């Protein structure tokens, strides 16, 4: 383990679960659920907050909103209002048992070990905080609900973009009891790792099965791990 780590700050996609879960399960599920949701809940006050978060030109009609969502997903645009809507759509899938998050086998045991050692676990993902809580609340692990192990959740709304140094500085400022050099951020995204390092965090690149090959030179510049067992 890296020296003096008091906080593990974890990415989700490609770090604790396969990239394919997000791309091949979650995104298609939301797109499939969207038309019925728009037809049945367009004027529902519970849905209105998600609809009205979209730019006005897209929130004006079901057709415009649906087309905009499909466009954003196809281009993998991480717009906060899209992430919030996706979380809302995924909730039904998680609640019904249709969706379970397939965590890598080392994740849940490490969560338990880190908790027992008094090390805080926090999450930082481009997915919305509600969507993060749904994912960790409905996993294939034992126990299936790991949310109680997680001290805090961060996304692009409450922290900022994951490739910006200021976002990590903001996260650290929310937990001033932990000096920046006691944080270890783990992500499959090299640009995110660079930003965390720039903020004074420790940070490693995670290379999981199904992740794209790392660019040349990454393993020369960064510590790369392939399992949390290496920590």
From Swiss-Prot:
The keyword Nucleus appears for this protein? yes
Keyword line: Amino-acid biosynthesis, Cytoplasm, Hydrolase, Magnesium, Metal-binding, Methionine biosynthesis, Nucleus
Predominant location of this chain? cytoplasm
Gene3D superfamilies to which the protein is assigned, alphabetical:
1.10.720.60, HAD superfamily/HAD-like
What sections of the protein cross the membrane? none
* Compartment annotation: Cytoplasm; Nucleus
- Protein's pathway: Amino-acid biosynthesis; L-methionine biosynthesis via salvage pathway; L-methionine from S-methyl-5-thio-alpha-D-ribose 1-phosphate: step 3/6; Amino-acid biosynthesis; L-methionine biosynthesis via salvage pathway; L-methionine from S-methyl-5-thio-alpha-D-ribose 1-phosphate: step 4/6
Disulfide cross-links:
none
Query: What InterPro entries does the entry give?
Result: Enolase-ppase_E1, ENOPH1_eukaryotes, HAD-like_sf, HAD_sf
Origin superkingdom: Eukaryota
Q: Which residues bind Mg(2+)?
A: 11, 13, 188
Q: Which cofactor does it need?
A: Mg(2+)
Q: What is its EC number?
A: 3.1.3.77
Instruction: Describe how the cofactor binds.
Output: Binds 1 Mg(2+) ion per subunit.
> Could you tell me the Gene Ontology terms of the biological process aspect for this record?
L-methionine salvage from methylthioadenosine
Q: What class of enzyme is it?
A: hydrolase
List residues binding substrate: 125-126, 162
What's the catalysed reaction?
5-methylsulfanyl-2,3-dioxopentyl phosphate + H2O = 1,2-dihydroxy-5-(methylsulfanyl)pent-1-en-3-one + phosphate
An example of a Gene Ontology cellular component annotation for this protein is: nucleus
Any one GO molecular-function label of the UniProt entry: acireductone synthase activity
Protein's UniProt keywords contain Metal-binding: yes
Question: What family is this protein classified in?
Answer: Belongs to the HAD-like hydrolase superfamily. MasA/MtnC family.
The function of this protein is: Bifunctional enzyme that catalyzes the enolization of 2,3-diketo-5-methylthiopentyl-1-phosphate (DK-MTP-1-P) into the intermediate 2-hydroxy-3-keto-5-methylthiopentenyl-1-phosphate (HK-MTPenyl-1-P), which is then dephosphorylated to form the acireductone 1,2-dihydroxy-3-keto-5-methylthiopentene (DHK-MTPene).
Quaternary data: Monomer.
The protein in question is named: Enolase-phosphatase E1
Which organism does this sequence originate in? Answer: Pyricularia oryzae (strain 70-15 / ATCC MYA-4617 / FGSC 8958)
């Amino acid at each position: 383990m890296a020296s003096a780590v008091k906080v593990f700050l974890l990415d989700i996609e490609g770090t604790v679960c396969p990239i394919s879960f997000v791309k091949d399960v979650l995104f298609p599920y939301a797109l499939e659920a969207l038309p019925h949701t728009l037809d049945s809940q367009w004027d529902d006050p519970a849905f209105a907050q998600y609809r009205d978060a979209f730019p006005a030109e897209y929130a004006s009609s079901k057709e415009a909103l649906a087309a905009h969502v499909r466009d954003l997903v196809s281009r993998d645009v991480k717009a906060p209002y899209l992430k919030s809507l996706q979380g809302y759509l995924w909730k039904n899938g998680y609640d019904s048992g249709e969706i379970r998050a397939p965590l890598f086998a080392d994740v849940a045991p490490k969560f338990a070990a880190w908790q027992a050692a008094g090390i805080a676990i926090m999450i930082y993902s481009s997915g919305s905080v509600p969507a993060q809580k749904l994912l960790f609340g409905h996993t294939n692990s034992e126990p299936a609900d790991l949310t109680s192990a997680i001290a805090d959740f961060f996304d692009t709304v409450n922290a900022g973009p994951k490739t910006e140094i200021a976002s990590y500085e903001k996260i650290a400022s929310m937990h001033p009891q932990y000096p920046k050099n006691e944080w270890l951020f783990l992500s499959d995204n090299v640009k995110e790792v660079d930003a965390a390092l720039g903020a004074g965090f420790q940070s490693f690149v995670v290379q999981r099965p199904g992740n794209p090959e790392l660019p040349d030179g990454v393993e020369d510049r960064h510590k790369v791990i392939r399992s949390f067992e290496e920590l």
